[in-house]
């Protein structure tokens, strides 16, 4: 679980809503020879086309994780998936029956893999917790005193017996060690699936290691990668995902950490997160960092939420306009709208430079309602705005903040930084500037860095008792990716990063 991700998520919608879906959709078509081909479909709502009307900023592509999940389904097929599910549910049924016999009561009326036990009056959740921790087991403890657990594919007979022993010891009861779990089901008839699933040919062909390996290789041959050549991806500089950086991801200590484990069980992760945050503060010249946003677009949204919270705290919550140069990446206006602002476009010249006269005019015209300027530095044209310090001064004179889009931060590292030029907040794309993989679209990490006055408004999390400005279900976003960036920064050092 990588201490909270990355992971893929899915949703489906009715046909009439498909043009409002975020993200890109790949569809099949025919080429001029009549052969089957695949192409980008339904991308007209993307930021580079619809800009402030785009819907794709609410999510980030997780193509790498979705591909892994897809291969899992391909390898196991419909029968394999069902067999795994039946085993998981059978273990849950066995635990329900066995623990109920010890004097507890399982209270979930319908369940697949998740159980919740009400405790007898003579047993407290703290007793259960103490025994469980002594056996290196984490359970869920509800506010009303109930205790919960979830079963999955990794739960084996040893784990089953450990769970039984915890509840038996707390109850002072003898228990019989299980040697096997019988197949069983508690799912009611009306809840059982009647429709077919995984009917496509691809889910019914590749069920041996060799077949699967060859199938993956055939797909691999159709893609361009660093194994073939450099990859042209516009102004977003990507880095080599070196083996030394990727190695930690295969270590169980990083892979198997649940995001909600007690803090004293995640001291290594917390130290890494703290150290990386300090490095990013130095690189950006800022005072605070949040690693919670899961993409650059999510970082923009989070940064704008921080600005809004700050303005509200000083009685300037009426400010609702964001000034954005015409050359800006489409995520900027899309994020501004998602965060509840309206956008004002500032002109650029033929070379992509901000038109200073138009900037001054638009800033003056909207100064009473101006919340921020969003500017990419260097711009998507590859231009370092020579007037960037003056631009920041103009915006600050209006009582507004400066949001620097860090998509092209690679060109700044070690030479200058957002804090030095006068910006108030920026996001970073760790999958661009700091070597984490892009995976054909994900997993991304888009931390935000802020000046001192904005630190109190960084995204919180309910886990820490402060959910203000929370933008992710996980407290540290895709924490499993962070060892890559930390390794890259530490191995490169100041000189290497600058060069």
Would you name each region that the model predicts?
Residues 1-39, 99-103, 112, 116-117, ...:
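Conserved PLP-enzyme active-site core in the AAT-like
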Residues 33, 79-182, 213, 219-224, ...:
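Conserved C-terminal alpha-helix-loop-beta "cap" of PLP-dependent enzymes
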Residues 36-107, 468-499:
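Structural motif of enzymes handling amino- and sulfur-group chemistry
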Residues 48-50, 74-80, 107-111, 192-193, ...:
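Gly-rich Lys/Arg/Thr-decorated short loops/hinges at beta-loop-alpha junctions or inter-strand turns
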Residues 85, 202, 262-274, 293, ...:
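Short acidic-aromatic active-site loops that bind/stabilize oxyanions
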Residues 157-232, 236-244, 249-255:
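Flexible inter-domain linker/hinge segments
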Residues 208, 253-294, 299:
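Conserved N-terminal alpha-helix of the aminotransferase class I/II PLP-enzyme fold
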Residues 233, 290-298, 323-327, 407, ...:
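Active-site nucleophile and cofactor-binding loops and adjacent substrate-binding regions
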């Amino acid at each position: 679980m990588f201490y909270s991700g990355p992971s893929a998520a899915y949703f489906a919608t009715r046909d009439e809503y498909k043009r409002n879906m975020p993200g890109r959709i790949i569809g099949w078509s025919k080429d001029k020879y009549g052969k089957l081909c695949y192409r980008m479909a339904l991308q007209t709502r993307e930021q580079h086309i619809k800009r402030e009307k785009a819907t794709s900023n609410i999510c980030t592509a997780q193509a790498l994780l979705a591909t892994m999940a897809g291969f899992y389904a391909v390898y196991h097929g419909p029968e394999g998936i069902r067999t795994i599910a039946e085993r998981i549910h059978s273990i849950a049924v066995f635990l329900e029956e066995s623990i109920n016999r010890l004097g507890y009561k399982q209270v979930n009326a319908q369940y697949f893999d998740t159980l919740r036990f009400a405790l007898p009056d003579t047993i407290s959740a703290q007793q259960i917790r103490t025994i469980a921790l002594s056996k290196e087991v984490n359970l869920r403890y509800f506010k009303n005193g109930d205790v919960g657990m979830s079963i999955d594919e990794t739960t084996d007979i040893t784990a089953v017996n450990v769970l039984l022993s915890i509840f038996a010891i707390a109850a002072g009861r003898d228990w019989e060690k299980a040697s096997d779990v019988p197949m069983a089901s508690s799912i009611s008839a009306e809840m059982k699936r009647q429709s077919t699933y995984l009917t496509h040919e691809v889910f019914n062909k590749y069920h041996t290691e060799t077949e699967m390996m060859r199938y993956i290789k055939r797909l691999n041959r159709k893609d361009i990668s660093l194994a073939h050549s450099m990859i042209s991806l516009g102004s977003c500089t990507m880095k080599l995902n070196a083996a030394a950086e990727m190695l930690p991801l295969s270590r169980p200590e990083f892979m198997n950490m649940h995001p909600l484990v007690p803090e004293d069980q995640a001291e290594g992760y917390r130290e890494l997160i703290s150290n990386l945050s300090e490095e990013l503060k130095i690189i950006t010249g800022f005072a605070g960092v949040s690693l919670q946003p899961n993409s650059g677009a999510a970082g923009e949204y989070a940064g704008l939420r921080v600005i809004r919270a700050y303005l509200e705290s000083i009685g300037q919550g009426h400010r609702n306009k964001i000034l954005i140069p015409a050359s800006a990446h489409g995520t900027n206006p899309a994020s501004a709208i998602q965060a509840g602002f309206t956008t004002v476009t500032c002109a650029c010249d033929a070379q992509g430079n901000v038109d200073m006269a138009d900037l001054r005019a638009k800033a003056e015209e909207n100064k009473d309602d101006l919340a921020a300027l969003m500017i990419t530095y260097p711009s998507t044209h590859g231009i370092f705005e020579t007037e960037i310090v003056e631009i920041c001064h103009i915006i600050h004179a209006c009582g507004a903040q400066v949001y620097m889009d860090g998509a092209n931060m690679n060109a700044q590292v070690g030479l200058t930084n957002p804090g030095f030029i006068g910006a108030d907040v920026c996001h970073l794309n760790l999958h661009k500037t700091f070597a984490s993989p892009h995976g054909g679209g994900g997993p991304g990490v888009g931390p935000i860095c802020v000046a001192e006055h904005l630190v109190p408004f960084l995204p919180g999390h309910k886990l820490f008792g402060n959910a203000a400005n929370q933008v992710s279900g996980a407290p540290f976003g895709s924490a499993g990716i962070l060892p890559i960036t930390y390794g890259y920064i530490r191995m490169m050092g100041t000189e290497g990063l600058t060069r």
